Amino acid sequence: MVRFIFVTGGVVSSLGKGITAASLAMLLQAKGFRVSVRKLDPYLNVDPGTMNPHEHGEVYVTDDGAETDLDLGHYERFTGVTACKCDNITTGAIYSKLLKDERLGNYTGITVQVIPHVTNIIKDFIMSNTNGFDFIICEIGGTVGDIEGLPFFEAIRQIGNKLKNANCLFIHLTLLPYVKTARELKTKPTQHSVKELRAIGISPNILVCRAERNISKSAIDKIALFCNIKPEYVIPAIDQKNIYLVPIAYHNSGLENKVLNFFNINVVPSKLDKWYDIIDKIKDSNSKVKIAIITKYHKTQDAYKSVIEALNHAGIYYKYKIDVLWINAENLTEENINKKLLDINGILVPGGFGVRATQGKMIAIKYARTNNIPFFGICFGMQLATIEIAQNLIGIQDAVTEEFKIKGTKIIEKINKNCEDATIKIKNAHISKCTYSEAFECDASTVYTNIHEDSNNLSTDKLQIETNFRNMSDIEKTMRLGAYPCNLVANTIAANAYKSLEINERHRHRYKFNNEFQNIFEQHGVVFSGFSQNKQIVEIIELPELRWFVGVQFHPEFKSKPFEAHPLFIQFIKATIEYNKSNEQQ
């Protein structure tokens, strides 16, 4: 029988509900249980794909092409379980489905209301696709008291009433603010948060209290008394220097054992060797390298969350600390770049969209290329690298990308329908796992076929959804989302890094390198080391005569994990370490 665990938050947002849910999932896995983690977001956007990264952070892309909340990245990195679109839902997706069903007459003329119709969709989402799991952990976005979150809280309240304590547990994460003048942690906000939660019919079974310092026994007893919870079920969540220390901190507090005790499940020893190994490497990391990330969305680091973590994973691999220097590309010029990038060991240009800040990024790419500094370009970063090479190395002064809609030689062009299934979203998920959530993006014009990217190689493990193009915008038609296979060229940087000639990586782009220019690029030393299966889309470029200069069309950061760093990030950090050592010897 599957058991449901709901993680809610109070007092303030950004307390770490996603890290808590991911940590608990990992700790239960370490005891041999099968766990799925899901995120329910109350905002009205259908998905975060069109949201400003300054507001929402990065868009995390799953294998099956879903644009999801960045917390799914935490779930994958902590548990190693591949997420899919059925692990994330929003109010926008719910209302989109509900209104389509109403227009199609599926509600047979009755009055459609928040209760029961919206809440029923939420409950169906939570309780679907549970086969094969011992626990389903659901994180509810936002904080208790938010008006947009009320249908979600009502839905999980109803689930709790139906399943009772034997199969349902509520974890509430709150903040204990430290008041310097009083020299103590204040419990009153937590008390009021629990009061708010209980007012809508949910009594938390476990309280996780976030604090910047240790919580005294008297404070825990006070929280337990006023929140009607046993003291042993008040779990401290003390700030950690590294997020990968959080799971072990929860383990030391007995979080997973408290969960098992609540469900009357026998507690068995945990297998946490790989996590202790990670912690040892983090603590042994005394040396560091300095990486400049050339950003467009500079106001929040969450816009590049997976990139940061992938760098850290490679740092853990080599027992090196990664010192990230955030560079606002809009402020980067030929005149100030020497000063701004002083003493850096590597340059990374991540993905992005639009013309803003591109000039600064290209200046950084030129600086890396001409000064032989390790460079890594991801998605748009690779595209800009080809434009910089065209302009400054090959001599195509008017080289541009079609995305900017300006006159010039289009080195980067829009993906078209001839580019190997690039006009639709490939669904690479486990088909049996995603049966319910497909209803949120399919309508009567949708046709399902089981097909591989190569039409001559049928495969039942991939789901291709071909949607009526008349109902799609031009942007939707050309977006290439999700995991696609890629063939590598032997004896290249990429092939040596992966130790394989066939890989599978996640994509999120609607433009590609113009293959008409491949020959002239090769004549100037560029190696095209990765292609889509029919060679229509360039996936990887290299400048092998330099220390390390690689651009990739995909997003390798989405597949990196603390215990399995991505091979390209490993090689990039290796190059920065060697570059740093060579500078120290001079």
UniProtKB/Swiss-Prot annotation:
Cite the binding residues for ATP.
14-19, 71
Q: Which UniProt keywords apply?
A: ATP-binding, Glutamine amidotransferase, Ligase, Magnesium, Metal-binding, Nucleotide-binding, Pyrimidine biosynthesis
Q: Which reaction does it catalyse?
A: UTP + L-glutamine + ATP + H2O = CTP + L-glutamate + ADP + phosphate + 2 H(+); L-glutamine + H2O = L-glutamate + NH4(+); UTP + NH4(+) + ATP = CTP + ADP + phosphate + 2 H(+)
Residues engaged in binding L-glutamine: 352, 380-383, 403, 510
Please give the activity regulation comment for this entry: Allosterically activated by GTP, when glutamine is the substrate; GTP has no effect on the reaction when ammonia is the substrate. The allosteric effector GTP functions by stabilizing the protein conformation that binds the tetrahedral intermediate(s) formed during glutamine hydrolysis. Inhibited by the product CTP, via allosteric rather than competitive inhibition.
EC class of this enzyme? ligase
Domain spans labelled RPE1 insert: 429-473
One GO cellular component this record assigns the protein to is: cytoophidium
**Which family does the UniProt entry place this protein in?**
Belongs to the CTP synthase family.
As a miscellaneous remark, the entry gives: CTPSs have evolved a hybrid strategy for distinguishing between UTP and CTP. The overlapping regions of the product feedback inhibitory and substrate sites recognize a common feature in both compounds, the triphosphate moiety. To differentiate isosteric substrate and product pyrimidine rings, an additional pocket far from the expected kinase/ligase catalytic site, specifically recognizes the cytosine and ribose portions of the product inhibitor.
Name of the protein in question: CTP synthase
Gene behind this protein: pyrG
